[in-house]
């Protein structure tokens, strides 16, 4: 029970009833009145439309040029084969896409387990799923199957619509339904905590394609909802401009006096005679210009170069907008 009348009850996961391998009922209670429908509807929409998953997006079948054709010795036409492939539950690990191959000959059904794949990165959840039937002993079928990771429903036309794109003959594109959740409904019942009887109990009935467990699906959906709501937690006045810290136009060391370099008296006097008072003035001079300075020889030039190098500076540096206003004012 909450400690204050203004505090909200926090629901807890009461029960997970596993009905089948792919279907489960998840119960949460207690919820404040009305929150059963609020959370139930939000989770339902996310689970149906926003969950990432895997789908077959492209297929190439040897001897087949387009989806409206048939293949001799195969009971199903190409359209039916593609529909059967769309129902295949498959999961890939560590990759966003993978291309699989299937080869089968001889009379009998062609099932998902006939697909050649790396068991370390690919898992076929429904290995006995029928893709087609071979009716002639001399017939064989070979196909290339591309599986991709995505979210929601993506029609083939949106993945291949540019006028500059040329679809290779024989490559068949499928509309991709990535969502691993096949069916979901929720029900809100009355719940009770001590003397309160106006609370909600949320029961979510969900069925997946087997690539994800119902409990994990709800956890991911709740995470997505939480991340989307984070923007509302720290609202700012959109009319109030953000104060950005102004970066100095010049490196502060360039604004320091040449005296800070601790040059020999001879070198320092030569620079002052040429009105070189700031380090920024000095680094813009070239070696040739400094050698033209009266009484400044190669030894003094070497000293100046070494001192500047120790501070990450060098002669002949070009500085835009030099000198700055504050130096001119001084």
From Swiss-Prot:
Record's keyword annotation contains Transferase: yes
EC number: 2.7.7.6
Swiss-Prot/TrEMBL catalytic activity: RNA(n) + a ribonucleoside 5'-triphosphate = RNA(n+1) + diphosphate
One GO location term (cellular component): DNA-directed RNA polymerase complex
Enzyme class: transferase
Annotated GO MF terms: DNA binding; DNA-directed RNA polymerase activity; protein dimerization activity
UniProt entry keywords in alphabetical sequence: DNA-directed RNA polymerase, Nucleotidyltransferase, Transcription, Transferase
InterPro entries per UniProt: DNA-dir_RNA_pol_insert, DNA-dir_RNA_pol_RpoA/D/Rpb3, DNA-dir_RpoA, RBP11-like, RNAP_asu_C, RNApol_insert_sf
Region (Alpha N-terminal domain (alpha-NTD)): 1-236
Location of the region described as Alpha C-terminal domain (alpha-CTD) in the Swiss-Prot/TrEMBL record: 250-330
Pfam (any one): RNA_pol_A_CTD
GO biological processes: DNA-templated transcription
Known function: DNA-dependent RNA polymerase catalyzes the transcription of DNA into RNA using the four ribonucleoside triphosphates as substrates.
Record text on subunit structure and interactions: Homodimer. The RNAP catalytic core consists of 2 alpha, 1 beta, 1 beta' and 1 omega subunit. When a sigma factor is associated with the core the holoenzyme is formed, which can initiate transcription.
Free-text comment on this protein's domains from its UniProt entry: The N-terminal domain is essential for RNAP assembly and basal transcription, whereas the C-terminal domain is involved in interaction with transcriptional regulators and with upstream promoter elements.
Family classification: Belongs to the RNA polymerase alpha chain family.
Protein name as annotated: DNA-directed RNA polymerase subunit alpha
Origin species: Blochmanniella pennsylvanica (strain BPEN)
Gene this chain is encoded by: rpoA
């Amino acid at each position: 029970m909450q400690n204050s009348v203004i505090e909200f009850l926090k629901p807890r996961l009461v029960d997970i009833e596993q009905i089948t391998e792919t279907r489960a009922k998840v119960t949460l209670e207690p919820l404040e009145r009305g929150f059963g429908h609020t959370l139930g509807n939000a989770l339902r929409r996310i689970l149906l439309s926003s969950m990432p998953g895997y789908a077959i997006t492209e297929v190439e079948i040897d001897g087949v040029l387009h989806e409206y054709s048939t293949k001799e010795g195969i009971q199903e036409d190409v359209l039916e084969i593609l529909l059967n492939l769309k129902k295949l539950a498959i999961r890939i690990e560590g990759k966003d896409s993978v291309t699989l191959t299937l080869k089968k000959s001889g009379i009998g059904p062609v099932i998902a387990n006939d697909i050649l794949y790396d068991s370390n990165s690919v898992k076929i959840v429904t290995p006995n799923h029928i893709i087609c039937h071979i009716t002639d002993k001399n017939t064989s079928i070979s196909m290339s199957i591309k599986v991709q990771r995505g979210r929601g429903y993506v029609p083939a036309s949106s993945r291949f619509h540019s006028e500059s794109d040329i679809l290779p003959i024989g490559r068949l594109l499928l509309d991709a339904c990535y969502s691993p959740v096949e069916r979901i409904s929720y029900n809100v019942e009355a719940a009770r905590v001590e003397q309160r009887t106006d609370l909600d109990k949320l029961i979510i009935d969900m069925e997946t394609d087997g690539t994800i467990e119902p409990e994990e699906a709800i956890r991911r959906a709740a995470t997505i909802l939480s991340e989307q709501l984070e923007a509302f937690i720290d609202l700012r006045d959109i009319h109030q401009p953000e104060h950005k810290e102004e970066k100095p136009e010049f490196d502060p060391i360039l604004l320091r006096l040449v005296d800070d370099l601790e040059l020999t008296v001879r070198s320092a006097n030569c620079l002052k005679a040429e009105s070189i008072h700031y380090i920024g003035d000095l680094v813009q001079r070239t070696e040739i210009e400094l050698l033209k300075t009266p009484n400044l020889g190669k030894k003094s030039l070497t000293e100046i170069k070494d001192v500047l190098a120790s501070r990450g500076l060098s002669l002949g540096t070009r500085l835009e907008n030099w000198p700055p206003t504050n130096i001119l004012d001084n």
